[in-house]
Swiss-Prot record:
The gene is KIN7G. Residues 824-840 have a biased composition (Basic and acidic residues). The keyword Nucleotide-binding applies. One of its GO terms (cellular component) is cytoplasm. It comes from Oryza sativa subsp. japonica (Rice). This is Kinesin-like protein KIN-7G. GO terms for biological process: microtubule-based movement. InterPro entries: Kinesin-like_fam (IPR027640), Kinesin_motor_CS (IPR019821), Kinesin_motor_dom (IPR001752), Kinesin_motor_dom_sf (IPR036961), P-loop_NTPase (IPR027417). Belongs to the TRAFAC class myosin-kinesin ATPase superfamily. Kinesin family. KIN-7 subfamily. Gene3D superfamilies: Kinesin motor domain. Pfam families: Kinesin. Residues 346-385, 733-814, 839-875 form a coiled coil.
Length: 906
């Protein structure tokens, strides 16, 4: 639906929440460093700027440093950046607080990768869309309406990316904010629907190739989500509706003079630099307390960002920079821009409007009151009052009665029309309202932390493939390693590393079903001790592999929760627009299909768990056969056996429930047969994953076995003596303790040797540094001596120059004295007549110039006369032709005409 879209503004009746004045905040600023590209590495580029900790960006070449809210290195993933600086803006938007997230930086610094991402590493926009629908699912006591719009600013022209016909849209302002007239707003029903609209808009966006990037954005884009939320049910009719906007902005990169462009690209670059320069001026004025005028209207971008930059909502700025030394100046300018933006103060408040259904109640009450007033008036007129009326008073009462009747009737008609229109709008919007598919929970459960949901295959289909021209070659990326960020190897945070070291079974922590279905818990949740002895993955490869496996296995299950209640059984990707009616399926079939899908996903997850437990059990049994006295391994085997039995029972119950559900629904049989091949594919992938995990476990256990080889003989001897019934001698236990203490002493000695080696290395480094410092001091002393010698030479040369100049002056004076009075007479003669000669020369030159000017004027006059002569000849020829035509038409003889003509002249 095309409408006049307000940015940072709301319909009439909108007002801030009646709460205490919100505390002042500042713009959240984050800086993201991308790694060096292969081309920069081949050129031998050096690191000019780097991330010093989590909050400081420091220069390698000087002592400059800037502090921000967060600073991310090249190995940081986009999901981590979203959790740190963008998620709180999205949460505020879901509560009615406006939010803006935008990326700023030079060309090829990674802005589009940060905002949009790819299938391996989704960007901020897909993560925000996914998070919004997750919040909707976890808020069963409210209902939501989501509308999206997508526009671009190309060469200072606003274009609609969701409507190809919407070009050169007009921007105007009124008391309620900035309005983009004619932009299309689309109501979205699921993450797949929103991502498909983004992908369609990206097809219309202007891109081009530059010296730094094969596909460079040539326009600014603004993706806006308008979020309406109201209480669910009839219990809270008086509560207002919250309305907010979330702007996700991908700015085009500023270009330096080193970018060789021409023609259209040069024009695009000039417009991009102009808008970004205006943005920098606006931010500088906003941070200047003495500024009286802020130039918001100097560019389309700043006009649209006026409400966000003026402090009417939360703002998060992500500045992407490159650490290469060739772009050191551009990186410094970006960091200065981010430092200025950090000082902008904002005061975010919640926006509330009156609910449409509350307006209906208001109109109904008003109509009822008007009808009561009208009935009372009619009743009073019928019964009458004992008044000594005159005719004039009766006439006046009749007139007032008629006026009141007309007014009341018109108000009744207006109220009925407004009521009908609002009822029609509510009926239309109810089809687009998103509600949670879960049952209402208590307040305590609603405040539980939200679990991270992964992207499904349908959602990933609308994200671009991994960009090959940004940072790394594809040869360095493994096929099954989910490398986020800019293609660097995945590096977990210290907290994540400690969590990964708890064991392989940690990734089996599954989401508990909120309904009455079977609850799924991980093994470490039931028996915390069962995971302590399991080996942790020692390489990033294993970590990345299991992250991919768990996300792929959970994706389809989580996707079913993010689809609205009226679209749970839709199997295709086409979504109804505002103008098309939505086909409603019966409630029973929708619940049955939803239930069967969830049971099927639980079946797949449990089968994967059983396969993993069996592989771990097999490995533990082999280890137990080799180490007969290891009680810890036996306990783990017992725990895993219990887990396998419990999961098999759950699988059997799920199979029974699936068969019962399938028997109750006829139409679901074909869908189940179609989905069986898709069930086999995750099982095959899980088997491959389990094989890889088994090999990792084997390597770990082999390393553990080698560490305990020196105790194997003693354990076997004590075991044989225990079987024979002999008492254990005390010297054996003492020997065992001695060997254990000896092993600890050896380990400590090894550590001491390592520390001594490190100390020796540090001493050698210090020695080298001392040598270099002494060498530098020697050079400084030598240079000082040379400078002194040079200064002495310079003074000598200056004195010699003065002596030579004095000799030259004396020689000239002697020569003048030798010429005598004759030479002086000649010089006086030349000086006397030289001004006269110069005056004559100047007069001659002036006369020559005047002559040339006159000749040029004469030439121009001659040319003009020739042109006039030619023009007159043409006119004369035309006159003769006209006369000939006249003679022919009138039939006059030529001789008579000549005689008359000559006679008249005679």
């Amino acid at each position: 639906m095309a409408s006049r879209h307000r940015r940072g503004a709301f319909p009439a009746g909108a007002k801030a929440a009646p709460e205490a004045e919100a505390a002042k905040e500042s713009v959240a600023v984050a800086v993201r460093f991308r790694p060096l590209s292969p081309r920069e590495v081949r050129r031998g580029e050096k690191i000019a700027w780097y991330a010093d900790g989590e909050t400081v960006a420091r220069s390698e070449q000087s002592n400059l440093a800037y502090a921000y809210d967060r600073v991310f290195g090249p190995t940081t993933t986009t999901r981590h950046i979203y959790d740190a600086v963008a998620q709180y803006v999205v949460n505020g938007a879901m509560k009615g607080i406006n939010g803006t997230i935008f990326a700023y930086g030079v060309t090829s610094s990674g802005k589009t990768h940060t905002m949009h991402g790819d299938q391996i590493s989704p960007g901020v926009i897909p993560l925000a869309v996914k998070d919004i629908f997750n919040i909707i699912q976890e808020t069963p006591n409210r209902e939501f309406l989501l509308r999206v719009s997508y526009l671009e600013i190309y060469n200072e022209v606003v274009n609609d990316l969701l409507n190809p016909a919407g070009q050169n849209l007009r921007i105007r302002e009124d008391l309620q904010g900035t309005i983009v007239e004619g932009i299309k707003e689309e109501a979205v029903l699921s993450p797949v629907h929103a991502l498909s609209l983004i992908a369609a808009g990206e097809e219309l966006r202007h891109v081009g190739s530059t010296n730094f990037n094969l596909l460079s954005s040539r326009s600014h884009t603004i993706f806006t989500l308008t979020i309406e939320s109201s209480p669910r049910g009839q219990s809270n009719e008086a509560e207002a509706v919250t309305l907010s906007q979330l702007n996700l902005i991908d700015l085009a990169g500023s270009e330096s003079s080193r970018v060789e462009t021409a023609g259209v690209h040069q024009k695009e670059g000039s417009y991009i630099n102009k808008s970004l320069l205006t943005l920098g001026k606006v931010i500088s004025k906003l941070t200047d307390e003495k500024a009286t005028h802020i130039p918001f209207r100097d560019s389309k971008l700043t006009r649209l960002l006026k409400s966000s930059l003026s402090g009417q909502g939360r703002v998060s700025l992500i500045c992407t920079v490159t650490p290469a030394s060739s772009n050191s100046e551009e990186t410094h300018n970006t960091l200065k821009f981010a430092h200025r933006a950090k000082h902008i103060e904002i005061q975010a408040t919640q926006n509330k409007i009156m609910d449409a259904r509350s307006l209906i109640k208001k109109y109904q009450n008003e109509i009822r009151q008007l009808k009561e007033e009208l009935e009372q008036l009619r009743r009073s007129i019928r019964t009458g009052t004992p008044i000594e009326d005159t005719m004039q008073k009766k006439h006046h009462l009749l007139e007032t009665k008629e006026d009141c009747n007309v007014k009341l009737q018109s108000r009744l008609e207006q109220g009925e029309e407004a009521k009908a229109a609002l009822l029609e709008r509510i009926e239309h919007l109810t089809e687009l309202i998103l509600v949670s598919a879960k049952a209402s929970r208590t307040t305590k459960s609603s405040h539980c932390p939200r679990r991270r949901h992964s992207f499904g295959e349908e959602e990933l289909a609308y994200l671009p493939y991994e960009r090959q021209d940004i940072i790394l070659d594809n040869e360095s990326n493994m096929l099954f390693v989910p490398i986020e960020g800019f293609g660097e190897k995945f590096k977990s945070s210290p907290k994540e590393e400690t969590e990964n070291q708890k064991g392989h079974l940690n990734w089996l922590n599954l989401r508990k079903c909120d309904s009455g279905s079977t609850n799924l818990t991980s093994s470490d949740g039931e028996n915390p001790s069962s995971t302590k002895s399991l080996p942790a993955l020692s390489t990033p490869l294993g970590i990345g592999f299991f992250n991919v496996t768990s996300e792929q296995r959970m994706s389809d299950y989580m996707l079913a929760e993010n689809v609205p209640a009226n679209l749970l059984c839709v199997g295709h990707r086409e979504f109804p627009s505002d103008s098309l009616p939505v086909q409603e399926t019966p409630l029973v079939s929708r619940k049955t299909s939803d239930h069967v899908d969830i049971l099927r996903e639980q079946f797949n997850i449990l089968s994967g768990e059983v396969a993993l437990h069996q592989s771990v059990l097999k490995r533990l049994s082999e280890e137990a056969g080799k180490n007969a006295m290891n009680e810890q391994i036996e306990m783990e085997m017992k725990v895993v056996n219990d887990e396998v039995k419990l999961n098999k029972q759950k699988i059997a119950s799920l199979e029974r429930r699936i068969s019962n559900s399938m028997s109750n629904s006829r139409g679901m049989h074909d869908n189940l047969e179609l989905s069986l091949p898709y069930i086999e594919i995750p099982e095959q992938l899980n088997e491959k994953a389990f094989q890889l995990e088994a090999s990792e476990c084997q390597e770990f256990l082999l390393s553990e076995r080698t560490t305990f080889q020196h105790n194997t003989g003693i354990v076997q001897e004590t075991g044989s003596q225990a079987h024979k019934g002999k008492p254990l001698p005390s010297d054996v236990s003492d020997e065992f303790l001695k060997k254990a203490s000896q092993a600890e002493i050896d380990e400590l000695k090894q550590r001491v040797s390592e520390l001594t080696e490190a100390k020796s290395q540090l001493d050698s480094c210090n020695h080298k540094l001392l040598e270099e410092s002494t060498y530098a001091k020697g050079l400084a002393s030598v240079t000082s001596v040379e400078l002194k010698a040079l200064s002495v030479k310079v003074t000598k040369l200056m004195k010699q120059n003065e002596r030579l100049s004095s000799e030259l002056a004396s020689g000239r004076n002697q020569r003048r004295g030798s010429h005598g009075p004759r030479g002086a007479r000649r010089e006086s003669h030349t000086k006397r007549y030289e001004p006269a000669r110069r005056g004559d020369m100047n007069a001659l030159e002036a006369m020559l110039k005047e002559k040339d000017q006159r000749q040029a004027e004469l030439h121009t006059k001659i040319e003009e006369s020739k042109q006039k002569e030619a023009f007159l000849e043409k006119e004369l020829a035309n006159m003769w032709t006209v006369l000939a035509n006249l003679k022919k038409t009138r039939g006059i003889d030529q001789e008579d005409f000549d005689s008359k003509y000559n006679g008249s002249w005679a």
